Amino acid sequence: MTFNIIKLENWDRKEYFEHYFNQQTTYSITKEIDITLFKDMIKKKGYEIYPSLIYAIMEVVNKNKVFRTGINSENKLGYWDKLNPLYTVFNKQTEKFTNIWTESDNNFTSFYNNYKNDLLEYKDKEEMFPKKPIPENTIPISMIPWIDFSSFNLNIGNNSNFLLPIITIGKFYSENNKIYIPVALQLHHAVCDGYHASLFMNEFQDIIHKVDDWI
């Protein structure tokens, strides 16, 4: 895990960062992602949808430095070389969830196998964060598979100055012979503008459409 320091005085985003950081401005955007081909391919290959979506999300995040920009435990501004997903897993018996992290991997099969191993070991632990220690370079991903939504927002008391993206996925639904899934993206305006939110959604849709290239 390498954290690269950003020298604020020389950063071309300095004015924007200081303005929105002082205001602590965050925002959310939700988009319906077409997963028609993706869902069919995942089913044919015998994979689960949730980890496959997590993999696709992390491909977009790790491709773009802006989504890896944050503040570390030493209160330094910078960006990580790579982020790992910290995702929720629901326990039907307790009706609570755990948060498990898995090492990111550019190879889908390797990531999927690591996910399955982590799931097997930690999913039944009655702790909120059973896999410890949790590295700093993680981003929160969750799924609410019981409901589709058109918007979703998290209200966070941002005393820790959390700048990284937060992604929430909803229940997939059918419309006009297509299958869609809502994806909510929460960003901090200090590091990400509307352009970057659009970049994430467009690249995520693209990698979902090109599932044949990586599965």
From Swiss-Prot:
GO molecular function: chloramphenicol O-acetyltransferase activity
This enzyme's EC code(s): 2.3.1.28
Keyword Iron included in the entry's annotation: no
Gene3D superfamilies: Chloramphenicol acetyltransferase-like domain (3.30.559.10)
Keywords, comma-separated and alphabetical: Acyltransferase, Antibiotic resistance, Plasmid, Transferase
Quaternary structure annotation from Swiss-Prot or TrEMBL: Homotrimer.
Protein's UniProt name: Chloramphenicol acetyltransferase
